[in-house]
């Protein structure tokens, strides 16, 4: 109530918000006296079609899913993999192989406690712990990699959890088509790459996203994904395998959000993010 009274006060002319949809939408609907710049929830996703750097791709994804225990608004939640699998430099990999290999990559990356604790940080709320436990139970999909609890001797009261990976079919939309904040990701089996791109676009257009990614060695696939993300207005990362990650999307070095899909009504930080906070007031008189 205190916050609501503050942000609707006539003297408040600019409101910046990052958080969940419910209060974010309340701000947009009720702060009529102010400009509201809101970053809300979305379903960030990645399409995997093919790769010529299979292990580097897995390492990159493992870091992405683990960083800050998935508690970044840019972290990928849904990874779309064709039912027939993907092509790699080591030959074809089935959907099940991709699932198992990504699980091994995450586990291997976090196998050293000093690395795991530095990358994961800690879970920030009891609600996130509940979501992790729900995912671990298998209620949302097949458990490919269960979350485990780690102890941090420097912060003995902290709640540290490794990522949980779930497998599901594209038809299981209730499971993966909403933001599940925390280290929870879905490897979604889709009919083919075209279906994956179409699904990615539909999710972003209807539910929003701050980031999208694609892995493919084929120019036509990259062109199709680029076109889809232009229509749905989301930042696209292509074939990231090194020290740059899809969830590292920061204002000033990148554009954080676009303001063009439901995940945010502004881009942090394009010219409008700054200029729209000001107005021009003129005065005239005879000389």
Regions found by a protein language model. Give the residues of each.
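Short beta-strand-to-turn element immediately C-terminal to the catalytic PLP-Schiff-base lysine
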Residues: 46-51, 79-83, 166-167, 187-190
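Short, flexible, solvent-exposed loop/turn segments with mixed acidic/basic and small polar residues
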Residues: 69, 173-178, 198-205
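Structural motif
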Residues: 18, 82-84, 168, 190-191, ...
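C-terminal segments
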Residues: 28, 34, 52-80, 87, ...
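Rossmann-like NAD(P) dinucleotide-binding subdomain of oxidoreductase/dehydrogenase enzymes
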Residues: 1-63
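Residue-level signal for inorganic ion chemistry
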Residues: 15, 82, 183
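Short glycine-enriched loop/turn motifs at secondary-structure junctions
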Residues: 9, 40-42, 73, 178-183, ...
